[in-house]
């Protein structure tokens, strides 16, 4: 029983942290702050899924955690490229069809 209380407490803390990051995404003074906050939300979502997996004793949620991690990484990479170059996909001027 104390183990479940610990997991539920950790779950509440992570969810409150996600809400704080959501405020940073909405109010963030710069685009870089918003990108970092979105990345943090992705990591916290992975933690929430892991804690629910432990609490409910579901083993196959590891695949979902990995997919969320991959999507969070790709989102951060795309936003970083957009911030650096102003566009995500660079078109070559010699590549005309």
Swiss-Prot record:
The chain crosses the membrane at residues 3-23, 35-55, 60-80. Keywords: Antiport, Cell membrane, Hydrogen ion transport, Ion transport, Membrane, Sodium, Sodium transport, Transmembrane, Transmembrane helix, Transport. Pfam families: MrpF_PhaF. GO terms for molecular function: sodium:proton antiporter activity. It is a multi-pass membrane protein. It is found in: Cell membrane. One of its GO terms (cellular component) is plasma membrane. Mnh complex is a Na(+)/H(+) antiporter involved in Na(+) excretion. PANTHER family: NA(+)/H(+) ANTIPORTER SUBUNIT F1, NA(+)_H(+) ANTIPORTER SUBUNIT F. Belongs to the CPA3 antiporters (TC 2.A.63) subunit F family. May form a heterooligomeric complex that consists of seven subunits: mnhA1, mnhB1, mnhC1, mnhD1, mnhE1, mnhF1 and mnhG1. This is Na(+)/H(+) antiporter subunit F1. The lineage of its organism: Bacteria, Bacillati, Bacillota, Bacilli, Bacillales.
């Amino acid at each position: 029983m104390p183990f479940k209380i610990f997991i539920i407490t950790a779950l509440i803390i992570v969810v409150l942290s996600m809400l704080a990051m959501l405020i940073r995404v909405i109010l963030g003074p710069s685009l870089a702050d918003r990108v970092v906050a979105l990345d943090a939300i992705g990591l916290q979502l992975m933690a929430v899924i892991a804690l629910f997996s432990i609490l409910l004793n579901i083993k196959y949620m590891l695949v979902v955690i990995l997919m969320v991690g991959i999507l969070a990484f790709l989102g951060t990479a795309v936003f970083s490229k957009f911030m650096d170059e102003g566009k995500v996909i660079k078109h070559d001027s010699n590549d005309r069809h």
